Amino acid sequence: DLLLSTRLSMTSGFSSRIDNVGELMNKGYELSISGDLIRTNDWKLTLNGMISQNKNEIKKLYKGNDISVGWNNLIKEGYPINVYKMVRWAGVNPANGDALYYTADGRITNTYNSNDAVVLDGKTPDPKYFGSFGANLSYKGWELAADFYFSGGNYIYNHIRFFTESDGAQYGNNQDKSMLYDQWKNPGDITNVPKQSINNSSYQSTRY
């Protein structure tokens, strides 16, 4: 089952409801271990660890229709849940400082078009693995514990960069220093920061 909030007509008196919109397959493993490294009348030291891996895939959606989630994510048959869909960043034109993007069919252009957004296979904000490890030390009724958590294998859209690297569009707000020091200035400059202009805009793309 795949339970999601779906919109309703406002004439119903409700804005949304939870519906079963498809089929989701989850599979993976979890391994945990715990043991006493030291055990005496006064002292006890216990170590523990856990790691988990999960893989999911959308097997079926109602009428096969894709579902947009937030700004850049998509629920689509045959892909992991929340897979990214966005326009691909192609760098900066060294001749004139224009921002460059890939079209849906792979050509390079200096014109941003949201219709050129493509599914980024295998790239989601959801961790591919996560886990924890820790220790617990006790002595005559006193106890000290520490736990650490980790995750990885996922891709996070950097919204801070989206707002602080606006290429001049948000000149009245705080901007990253790279906008000043690394920006394109002269023909032939090789950089990943386009020329600065108040007419620019920070578009949603794989740049961030």
Locate each region found by the language model.
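Repeated loop/turn-to-beta-strand initiation elements of outer-membrane beta-barrel proteins
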Residues: 1, 41, 141-146
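Flexible, solvent-exposed coil segments and beta strand-coil junctions
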Residues: 6-16, 106-117, 192-205
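Conserved small-residue
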Residues: 19, 24-25, 29, 36-125, ...
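Residues on the lipid-exposed face of transmembrane beta-strands in outer-membrane beta-barrel proteins
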Residues: 31-35, 133-139, 146
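Transmembrane beta-barrel strands of outer-membrane/channel proteins
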Residues: 47-53, 137, 146-150
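Outer-membrane beta-barrel transmembrane strands
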Residues: 123-139, 202-208
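Extracytoplasmic gating/loop element in the C-terminal half of outer-membrane beta-barrel translocons
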Residues: 151-208
